[in-house]
Design a protein with these regions (language model features):
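Small-aliphatic-rich amphipathic alpha-helix that forms the alpha element of a beta-alpha
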Residues: 40-42, 85, 105-157
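A glycine-rich helix N-cap at a beta->alpha junction
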Residues: 75-78, 83-87, 160-181
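Short Asp/Glu-rich motifs
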Residues: 32, 59, 155-156, 163
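N-terminal amphipathic, basic helical "cap/leader" segment at the start of enzyme domains
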Residues: 1-94, 194-196
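C-terminal helix-cap and adjacent tail motif
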Residues: 2, 10-13, 19-20, 93, ...
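Short Gly/aromatic-enriched secondary-structure transition segments
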Residues: 53, 99-103
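Acidic, glycine-rich active-site loops and adjacent beta-strand->loop/helix elements
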Residues: 91, 149-152, 176
């Protein structure tokens, strides 16, 4: 049985963590990007399907290309952030299941079932996106998850010729506290929960 994390860890992951609109002028390294993946890949997905595909926009050219396909306010955030990740979902994730889930023929569950493929890819890449945020926070980085972009245009610009579609985008770096406002309310347990 695992021991509960201490308050400092919970604060870093949740209670004191924020979604940032701006970042300090401090670079994020390739090693840190790899560390994020090497942590987040252990988060559970259905049949270990791991449908998320990430493009890390690190260069000025890549960030400008992405920013042009977003709402203006989001584009500004992308241009200012050290890195922005495009969290995509591979609609052919099931082709990897013989390797990733070898103890049964999980691939056959999905072949020809487009509705199940799309639901599974979206749900599990969204889960992986959440693991991405928590992994980044655990490694001392900050994030800013966003929609507010032209999905079809992003897919054409970054995933052309593949079966990958964009889910959401997320800036990454060392957050500038001057870029955020006071935290919005988080209601108590009884407001949104029922125990039956």
């Amino acid at each position: 049985m695992s021991e509960p994390l201490n308050d400092a860890a919970l604060d870093q992951l949740f209670r004191e963590a924020r979604s940032y609109n701006g970042y300090l002028d401090t670079p994020v390294t390739q090693k840190q990007l790899e560390q994020i993946w090497d942590v987040m890949k252990f988060g559970p997905t259905s049949a270990n399907c791991l449908p998320a595909r990430i493009i890390w926009c690190n260069s000025d050219a890549a960030k400008q290309k992405l920013a042009a396909l977003c709402m203006p306010a989001n584009g500004d955030k992308i241009l200012q952030a050290p890195v922005t990740a495009i969290i995509g979902m591979d609609l052919e994730f099931y082709e990897n299941l013989p390797e990733l889930f070898p103890h049964t023929d999980a691939r056959s569950w999905f072949v020809g079932n487009d509705a199940l493929i799309e639901k599974t890819a979206f749900r599990n890449s969204s889960l992986q996106g959440a693991y991405f945020i928590l992994a980044a926070r655990a490694l001392g980085l900050d994030t800013g998850a966003m929609s507010g972009f032209n999905n079809a245009a992003v897919d054409e610009a970054f995933f052309a010729g593949t079966k990958v579609q964009s889910n959401f985008i997320c800036t990454l770096g060392y957050g500038d506290k001057a870029s955020i406002f006071e935290r919005s309310p988080r209601p108590a347990f009884n407001r949104f929960n029922s125990v039956i």
